[in-house]
Amino acid sequence: MLNAQQFLNQFSLEAPLDESLYPIIRDICQEVKVHGDKALKMYNLTFDHTKTDHLEISHEQIKAAFDTLDEKTKQALQQSYERIKAYQESIKQTNQQLEESVECYEIYHPLESVGIYVPGGKASYPSTVLMTATLAQVAGVENIVVVTPPQPNGVSQEVLAACYITQVNQVFQVGGAQSIAALTYGTETIPKVDKIVGPGNQFVAYAKKYLFGQVGIDQIAGPTEIALIIDDTADLDAIVYDVFAQAEHDELARTYVIGEDAQVLKDLESRIAKALPNVDRYDIVSKSIANQHYLIHASNFDEACHVMNTIAPEHASIQTVNPQPYIEKVKYVGALFIGHYSPEVIGDYVAGPSHVLPTNRTARFTNGLSVNDFLTRNTVIHLSKDTFEQIADSAQHIAHVEALYNHQQSILIRQS
């Protein structure tokens, strides 16, 4: 256990990306740009040990995955989809009916095409499809494309079922940096898209960073993280599994628990130690707990909030007797979960907001994915002659001050 000042003195995050990967990513992207599908099939064999004669999964296969899914899983995915859809519809920016006198305003248009990366790796993630494709669908994106790493037994049936529910247009079994390059450049089979979203490993994150500017991206994601503020009213057994739930994602997952009561933190520490040997996914959880788990003793409310805002975690959870004051004070987090019945895991699946959230302290300046990230926003300026005449002198004078005389002339010629 550390006191708040000790923690803050040593707190740092590793660079979110391993710079040594840069040459590898560059070479992969160039290979895909030049050789297209041939390169993708080669990388599937090299990295995923899977031979793929056909990169695209047919609509018949996608529908069959949904049709043959067990009813309980189907209902769970459907409920998640409905809640996500309803929430995103409620926050979607829309074009407003304007009075004729309004001369400056904004209009919104959906992106034309979006690529979604759905991780394979250590687990199957249909929730990633729901938390991304639903948003694109609500926005009105015309072409939604999913890429996901090939598996020896084929792409997860749950992932394909989620693609069916969200009306994804195309699904391709290709992953890693090569899939990001394919979505950026386009290949014989995979269409070029305008924006790529979705979480992935370091190769995926670095490819998104490398290709940003040629394609839009949501974020460059690092390891997942949660920070909790608790007091003596928190259910410590539940907190143990809030910690384990985050830790099981990745050996590098970070978990922080902040509290003003040192004894509560000690009790939690002993419960974690007792439960750890028998936890599912022990190999992953134990490494995360050993290397990336912190108990932090804060001296008061303000200090607890300061620690939370400094961490700026992807997920923040407040489980105290009176959580309301924290809602205003905790400012820099990806998502804020309040109370015993709002565990972070509910946000992973069915709460409604997307679980694609900023990591590595980027919550200090960016936000979680939403329907509005799949819209362009255009300003429209349509001035009357009267308004032009009221402001033209200022415009032409500023142009003169900046020595941009053709700018100035563009105004003057309209005044004459």
From Swiss-Prot:
Enzyme class: oxidoreductase
InterPro entries listed in its UniProt record: Ald_DH/histidinol_DH, Histidinol_DH_CS, Histidinol_DH_monofunct, Hstdl_DH
Cofactor remark: Binds 1 zinc ion per subunit.
Chain positions recorded as substrate binding sites: 224, 246, 249, 315, 348, 402, 407
Gene Ontology CC: cytosol
GO terms of molecular function: histidinol dehydrogenase activity; NAD binding; zinc ion binding
Disulfide pairings: none
Record keywords: Amino-acid biosynthesis, Histidine biosynthesis, Metal-binding, NAD, Oxidoreductase, Zinc
Cofactor(s) the record lists: Zn(2+)
Annotated metabolic or biological route of this protein: Amino-acid biosynthesis; L-histidine biosynthesis; L-histidine from 5-phospho-alpha-D-ribose 1-diphosphate: step 9/9
One Pfam family cited in the UniProt record for this chain: Histidinol_dh
Binding site for NAD(+): 117, 178, 201
Catalytic-site annotation from UniProt: 314 (proton acceptor), 315 (proton acceptor)
Coiled coil residues, start to end: none
Chain sites annotated for binding Zn(2+): 246, 249, 348, 407
Enzyme Commission (EC) number: 1.1.1.23
Annotated catalysed reactions: L-histidinol + 2 NAD(+) + H2O = L-histidine + 2 NADH + 3 H(+)
One annotated GO biological process: L-histidine biosynthetic process
Stated family: Belongs to the histidinol dehydrogenase family.
Protein task: Catalyzes the sequential NAD-dependent oxidations of L-histidinol to L-histidinaldehyde and then to L-histidine.
Protein name: Histidinol dehydrogenase
Gene: hisD
